[in-house]
Amino acid sequence: MKPMYRSRSWRRKYVRTPGGRVVVHFERKKPKIAHCAICGRPLNGIPRGRPVEMRKLPKTKKRPERPMPYLCPRCMRRVMKEQIRSQIMKG
């Protein structure tokens, strides 16, 4: 095993070869799941991928196509209601 693969930053994947041997393949780990910027809940619709993998995806597959995709739907509604209420109070 190469010294660079001894650290746990590489994921170990056990693969059975056509000859019947079991060998170890090393892969980079996937990043953590995206979380809401306000409440911290995990976000749906955002894939877990390394930057190299994310670069290959189209823009619509990287994040939801709605206002404030970095917030969960509950927090997004709350923020939008606050913005609308503040506009109503001004006008």
UniProtKB/Swiss-Prot annotation:
It comes from the Archaea. PROSITE patterns: RIBOSOMAL_L34E. One of its GO terms (cellular component) is ribosome. NCBIfam families: PRK04059.1. The lineage of its organism: Archaea, Methanobacteriati, Methanobacteriota, Thermococci, Thermococcales. Residues 48-69 are annotated as: Disordered. One of its GO terms (molecular function) is structural constituent of ribosome. Belongs to the eukaryotic ribosomal protein eL34 family. Keywords: Ribonucleoprotein, Ribosomal protein. InterPro entries: Ribosomal_eL34, Ribosomal_eL34_C_sf, Ribosomal_eL34_CS, Ribosomal_L34e_arc-type. One of its GO terms (biological process) is translation. Pfam families: Ribosomal_L34e (PF01199). The gene is rpl34e. This is Large ribosomal subunit protein eL34.
